[in-house]
């Protein structure tokens, strides 16, 4: 089992604002795990994000994003992604097809995983690093407010490092994702 390193893992979203380059905000409160099986159907990806943790380094916009006009975190406190189908595309790329639940709406999306590196050992023990992106349309999830300001396309991005916790990942069953403030699990089958 691999636990996400809270120091080296970042979950964020990126969106265009009035035609500017991408503007981003991060979600420091998250949980999740991966089981990656190149030879069978045991692959699984689960990620959950606490929406109230959104942080764009501006208190005014943090409050606005949490409000009913935008993320409505009181009504929709969590965003989650679940996949049981991961298609590997070479040694360092994969696509996890699954369901993204956001703002009370669940839709099929693809989480594109790149720079996947799971060396057998490192100085700190076994690690696994990756970058992942999912492109979604805000309008698909009921976000009509401000489409003219910020555009419709949102890039949800994860840059992560997992640190091995379980000495026997082959036989480990992935538990459901649980949010634990910038911690999570990343499991890999060899």
PLM feature segments, named:
Residues 1-190:
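Low-complexity, acidic/polar, glycine-enriched regions of mature
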């Amino acid at each position: 089992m691999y636990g996400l390193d809270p120091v080296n893992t970042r979950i964020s979203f990126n969106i265009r604002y009035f035609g500017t380059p991408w503007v981003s905000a991060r979600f420091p409160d998250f949980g999740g795990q991966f089981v990656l099986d190149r030879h069978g159907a045991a692959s699984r990806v689960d990620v959950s994000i606490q929406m109230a943790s959104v942080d764009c380094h501006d208190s005014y916009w943090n409050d606005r994003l949490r409000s009913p006009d935008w993320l409505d975190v009181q009504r929709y406190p969590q965003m989650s992604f679940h996949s049981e189908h991961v298609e590997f595309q070479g040694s360092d790329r994969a696509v996890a097809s699954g369901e993204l639940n956001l703002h009370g709406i669940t839709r099929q999306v693809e989480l594109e995983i790149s720079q996947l590196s799971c060396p057998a050992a490192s100085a700190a023990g076994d690690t696994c690093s990756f970058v992942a992106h999912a492109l979604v349309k805000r309008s698909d999830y009921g976000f009509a407010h401000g489409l003219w300001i910020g555009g419709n396309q949102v890039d949800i991005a994860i840059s992560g490092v997992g640190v091995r916790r379980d000495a026997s990942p082959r036989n480990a069953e992935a538990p459901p994702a649980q949010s634990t403030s910038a911690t999570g699990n990343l499991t890999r089958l060899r």
